[in-house]
Amino acid sequence: YDFSNLRPHVDFFNAMTYDIHGGWSSHAGHNSPLYQSPPGDADGSIETGINYLANTRGLPEEKINMGIPFWGKKYNTSSINGSFTGSVIDMHYSEILPLVGNGWTYQWDNTAKCPYLIKDDQSKIITYDNPLSIQHKCEYAQNRNLGGVMVWALGYDDMASEESLTGAINLYWLNIEKSKKSILPEEIELNTYPNPFNPKMKINFYLPYKTEVNLSLYDMRGRL
């Protein structure tokens, strides 16, 4: 792409910072490592991808959105960076989550800042993202002043239960943004009293960014 011509006309660029490793790779590896693992890995990482877009292609970092995958990859291998055989299978997070502790052992790669699972018989591994790795990714994006984060795909989350990956982005990205940009008071109190001529009350307010709002209603005796 001719980024120099695109820059003035595009609000943001979604960087697909996943599929770093796969069936085309010379070894197994994380789907979306924040940093190269092993160090210097030629397949790269999120950081090397963002560096390329910013430093080599000249994209303003504030226009780059980091991609976060809600899926992982299953390899026929016994180690995270080992050689593998056969096909590499994509798996949704909703399919991976029930496996943790059920025939699969959880591992954390502190270099890549990513989790993975090893099958108890040492025959397979699954690389994926979880709320902890998403926390590291959101904090990295914030520290580099990136434009934001984007995901592929919302429907791959554990939709039947907690939607924990979506919740992690809400917690670690939106709360970071709130602390950075907040111009609203943390609390505001409104007093209203019964009116037989107007028994209904409507409260309108505008929020300049996404955030959670908690409303507490008390009666005349101060009871919640």
Set out the residue ranges of the language-model regions.
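Glycan-binding loop/region signatures in secreted carbohydrate-active enzymes
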Residues: W24, H30, K63-Y140, G167-W173
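Substrate-binding surface in catalytic domains of secreted glycosidases
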Residues: Y1-L99
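Generic structural signal for well-ordered alpha-helices
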Residues: F3, I46-N51, C138, E163-N170
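C-terminal outer-membrane/trafficking sorting elements
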Residues: K180-L224
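Conserved, well-ordered alpha-helix/loop/beta-strand core segments that scaffold catalytic motifs
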Residues: Y140-G147
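Acidic-and-aromatic substrate-binding clefts and catalytic sites of carbohydrate-active enzymes
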Residues: G155-A160
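Short, compositionally biased serine/threonine- and acidic-rich segments at solvent-exposed termini, linkers
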Residues: L174-K178
